[in-house]
Amino acid sequence: MNANTDILSLRVHAALDALRRGLPVIVADDADRENEADLILAADTLTVPEMARMIRDGSGIVCLCLTPERAERLQLPPMAAENGSRYGTAFTVAIEAAQGVTTGVSAADRTTTIRAAIHPDAKPGDLVRPGHVYPIVARAGGVRERRGHTEASVELARLAGFSPAGVLCELMNPDGTMMRGQQVQDYAERHDLPQLSVAELAEWLQREPA
């Protein structure tokens, strides 16, 4: 094991430790792809304060990343019959919890919706459509098949010992531009959050399949 391997392993395990403690991880994708950093949480540990953080510090578009099996079980059809998005992000129709919410917009309501969707006994009727939470279906092959935030969030949740479902939101600057580079670094240091890239996770999984 060389020094680079040690550093990579430390970064991955720091991210998993944060997720186990209910804290978000900052995950960046490739500079020649979206070149954005997302706050990612394991859906099982989501709390109202962490949802509020995502809404406050992110784009406001909070997504629930699911396996194909869970999306099929909940009968979540694609948002569009033909996916024309640049990177093939597999959005389904937006959702809301059928019970326990008001307008569905608040941090508490969105947390309730996500908890309803990931409950072990969740059924299609537990959700209404459309809503204010945006499910995305991860590829079955994870980051080995598609190097996206969606797949990374599901992989990280699974590796941390939770159900394979993640919550994410893109980090945004107060002026409405996307956080990148040093801005992301400053945010991570200010909030003491670990950082990881999708590429690093894919490399680690290739060497240490889990």
UniProtKB/Swiss-Prot annotation:
Pathway: Cofactor biosynthesis; riboflavin biosynthesis; 2-hydroxy-3-oxobutyl phosphate from D-ribulose 5-phosphate: step 1/1
Binding site for Mg(2+) 2: E34, H149
One Pfam match: DHBP_synthase
Entry binding sites for Mg(2+) 1: E34
Site (Essential for catalytic activity): H132, E170
GO cellular component: cytosol
Cofactor(s) needed by this chain: Mg(2+); Mn(2+)
GO MF annotations, alphabetized: 3,4-dihydroxy-2-butanone-4-phosphate synthase activity; magnesium ion binding; manganese ion binding
UniProt cross-references to InterPro entries, sorted A to Z: DHBP_synth_RibB-like_a/b_dom (IPR017945), DHBP_synthase_RibB (IPR000422)
Alphabetized UniProt keyword annotations: Lyase, Magnesium, Manganese, Metal-binding, Riboflavin biosynthesis
Top-level taxonomic group: Bacteria
Annotated positions binding D-ribulose 5-phosphate: R33, E34, D38, R146, R147, G148, H149, T150, E170
Reaction(s) catalysed by this chain's protein: D-ribulose 5-phosphate = (2S)-2-hydroxy-3-oxobutyl phosphate + formate + H(+)
Subunit structure, as described in the record: Homodimer.
Family under the similarity heading: Belongs to the DHBP synthase family.
Protein's name in the database: 3,4-dihydroxy-2-butanone 4-phosphate synthase
Organism: Chromobacterium violaceum (strain ATCC 12472 / DSM 30191 / JCM 1249 / CCUG 213 / NBRC 12614 / NCIMB 9131 / NCTC 9757 / MK)
Gene: ribB
